[in-house]
Amino acid sequence: MQNFPVISSILSATPVGLFLQDKYQFSVNATCKLLKTGINHSYLITDGASNFVFRLYSLNWRNQTEIREEIKLLNLLRDNNIPVSYPLKDAAGDYIQTLNAPEGNRYGVLFSSEGEKQLNFSTDLHHKIGETMARIHHVTHNLQLQRVTYTPQVLLKDSFERLKQFLPADTDEMQWMAATQKYLLDELAMADAGKLRQGVVHMDIWFDNLNITEDGEVTIFDFDFCGNGWLCLDLAYYILQLHSTEKVEAERDEKLKSFLAGYESIAKISDEEKRLLPMLGVSMYFFYLGIKCQRFDNWANVFLNATYLKRFINLLVKKYFDENVVKAINVN
């Protein structure tokens, strides 16, 4: 019988748990449970009262240099007392594990875990998240990692090329995306770079990557997309997600105001950064649509099709553009 190559697999939680039990010297009562199969696969390790998350990177998603740079960043932030989920060494002093999966060797890292996710949270917590993001940026300002730099090419051009594989160019949605891409590229090219802080960005701070304890302590995790770029990209993405999750406008505006106040209690947002936030938010939509297309074979195929993309563009991307970018143009 012919053997066929594998592009993706889900490793059974039980042997993964035994592997980690040996590597990290967990107790014999430690358990391992599959949490999520997404861009990477996550496993919850519970040993007594302690929880950990083991991230198993998809094949060829991140190389060892990129993972080491993420680890270096997290350790730097932890050393500066910033509440992040941090990597843990095994008994031999190693951070990165190599697991022989059917598709090839996959890398894994064990992270600390504390608190739980919340879809909606208080105005005060948004203020605290703003403070925490600013503290991260204070540390990462002018820092550079050996990872991707999020240029307009990466955000808008590369992502749009991937989208072309899934939506015909003559559809209304693709024609709108093409026109919007040109507008955004032109605007970003004219941005006053001297007034835009640069450094290392998280790129994915939203409720799904925040854990909150019962006493209101916030931990930021999942730095898988960290890289180099304008620091205001993180602000733009958080605001974008706030618009997506908070449907009552008055409550959303109050929480947004609190988030920005929290941020600016630590670090000043320049007028040029504020001007670009709506445009960068739309650019982030472009980028993550591109990621979904890039990872069709081993993630997004369960939902990604032409109908999904048309709805996403009309109900999220275009709506956000009209309500924020176009509105700002009309005001000015």
How would you describe each model-predicted region?
Residues F4, Y288-N332:
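ATP/Mg2+ or Mg2+-diphosphate-binding catalytic cores
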Residues G38-A49, V53-F54, P87, L185-L233:
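Active-site acidic catalytic loop and adjacent metal/ATP-binding pocket
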Residues G93, G104-N120, E161-P168, Y288-V302:
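A glycine-centered beta->alpha junction motif in the catalytic cores
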Residues N120-Q175, Q198:
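A cross-family kinase active-site recognition segment
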